[in-house]
Amino acid sequence: MSKDVKPTRKNLMAIEDRIELSERGHDTLEKKRDGLIMEFMDILDQAQDVRSDLDENYERAQRNINMARAMEGDVAVRGAAAALKEHPEITTQSKNIMGVVVPQIESTKVKKSLDQRGYGLVGTSARIDEAADAYEELLETIILAAEVETAMKKMLDEIEKTKRRVNALEFKLLPELHEAQEYIEQKLEEQEREEIFRMKKIKAKKEEEEEENPVADTESAAEAAVTEAGQ
């Protein structure tokens, strides 16, 4: 890049402005990256808790449904499930975390009371109720896990994108700009030294000519004086 820049003071000022702007942008992106990482770590902690809950709730739901089938039979369990009239409803909204839009999943009608499940209290046992409770809680955990996992992925993508931009400024653009700045400054200094050397050379030559022709200089001065007196 440095060899492609014309070494002028105008270009030097333009590059210095670009360096200042790039350094400010680099600092801003670094702060954003660090903030995103902190937010990501919070979400990661939450995700680990949710995964643990998901495993526990899944095992409990499987254990309870197996117990209900063993005690009541598949027909009774399927009949209780088929009696369900109100199915869970899920709505999605969004929230902003440091410029990253992540989903916020809201669920309703997941947890139900005994009379909301549709099957009669007579003819069913507590085993079926326990299985229903376990699966309702499992579904709520799955919904929360989907929200957290999606947010974590979006945050991670934004962190990687921000890191690439920081690295591009730090390891490519800014070094190229500093190299161009040094190149122009060096060339301008060379031009200044050459100009000083040229002026000194002209001055020395003039002084040398004056020393070689002192009589001519005296005669010229005398002629000038006579001319002035005659006027």
UniProtKB/Swiss-Prot annotation:
Signal peptide feature range: none
InterPro entries cross-referenced by the UniProt entry: V_ATPase_D (IPR002699)
Residue ranges, compositional bias (Low complexity): 215-231
Entry's Gene Ontology cellular component terms: plasma membrane
Keyword vocabulary terms for this entry: ATP synthesis, Cell membrane, Hydrogen ion transport, Ion transport, Membrane, Transport
This protein's record includes keyword Ligase: no
One Gene Ontology MF term: ATP binding
Presence of the UniProt keyword Magnesium in the record: no
Disordered, as annotated region: 204-231
Compartments, as annotated in UniProt: Cell membrane
Membrane topology, record value: Peripheral membrane protein
GO annotation, biological process: proton motive force-driven plasma membrane ATP synthesis
A Pfam family per the record: ATP-synt_D
Stated role: Component of the A-type ATP synthase that produces ATP from ADP in the presence of a proton gradient across the membrane.
Subunit record text: Has multiple subunits with at least A(3), B(3), C, D, E, F, H, I and proteolipid K(x).
NCBIfam families according to UniProt: PRK00373.1-1, PRK00373.1-4, V_ATPase_subD
PANTHER family from the UniProt entry: V-TYPE ATP SYNTHASE SUBUNIT D (PTHR11671)
Family note: Belongs to the V-ATPase D subunit family.
Protein name from the UniProt record: A-type ATP synthase subunit D
Gene that produces this protein: atpD
